[in-house]
Regions:
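The feature marks the mature, well-folded catalytic cores of soluble enzymes
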Residues: 1-243
Length: 243
């Protein structure tokens, strides 16, 4: 079992830029409130810090409205980092912005190359394997390139298929334990988590699945009291924050 799949010493975040109001949206729910986003970002950093990690806070990138979503630009493993190649054209340049910091932190750096596309939001590292969800942002070529990198490093990788109504694989799931997944019912129904223990979010609280296990805590979006209670009933310590 790869226990380190939720054990972290460091986290990289990026301050939201004022241009975030021009960012990509799966569903148009109106323009974000910049001041609120800054406040929410601070709460996120505080939650990470209280979970026991050292936070590396990168400066905002005004030319990349989605630049704060650093997860999509790289897959960080204990001994190597793989630079992604985002599927959204407006986000391609984000990788070059974060790469220098990652090269400082990792000795072994790999890259997904043109014409492949893959985003970190479609990759879930469990205690058994690396699950990669094919999606509108992650294509067959990108998945194949990633497989060619991580399998020689000793990992097991499995491709799954994200339902078309879901933007990223991890929009609807997150890791709770080495063999336990928090998931929406619609994603679980695809069969991608066969062989795992699955905790379903409450009906109507699907957005709560986009959480993150960091050491002893599950950091999840606020406003989903039923799912928070479900996680606590399963023995997890939960930090709910605005996001």
């Amino acid at each position: 079992m790869m226990e380190y799949s939720y054990q972290f010493t460091h986290a990289i975040v990026r301050q939201p830029a004022k241009s975030i109001i021009k960012g990509l949206r799966a569903v148009d729910i109106g323009s974000p409130d910049y001041d609120q986003m800054i406040s929410d970002h601070k709460d996120y950093v505080d939650a990470l810090t209280s979970a026991g990690v050292a936070v590396i806070n990168l400066t905002a990138l005004d030319k990349f409205p989605d630049g704060q979503f650093v997860e999509d630009t790289a897959l960080c493993l204990p001994k190597a980092v793989i630079l992604m190649r985002p599927g959204a054209p407006s986000r391609l340049g984000e990788v070059n912005e974060i790469a220098p910091k990652l090269r400082e932190l990792f000795e072994d750096v790999y890259e997904i190359e043109n014409p492949g596309h893959i985003e970190g939001g479609d990759i879930l590292v469990t205690g058994k394997e690396i699950l990669v969800g094919r999606s509108a942002r992650t294509d067959e070529n990108g998945v194949r390139q990633l497989s060619g990198i991580v399998i020689p490093l000793g990992y097991v990788m499995r491709e799954v298929f994200t339902p078309s109504e879901i933007l990223h694989f991890k929009t609807d799931c997150s890791l709770l334990g080495p063999d336990e997944i928090l998931s929406t019912k619609r994603l679980q129904a695809s069969g991608c988590f066969d062989g795992y223990k699955v905790v379903n979010v409450a009906d109507g609280e699907e957005a709560a699945a986009n959480a993150i296990r960091v050491n002893d805590y599950v950091i999840m979006p606020g406003g989903f009291p039923q799912t928070k209670a479900i996680l606590e009933e399963h023995g997890y310590k939960v930090k709910a924050i605005n996001n």
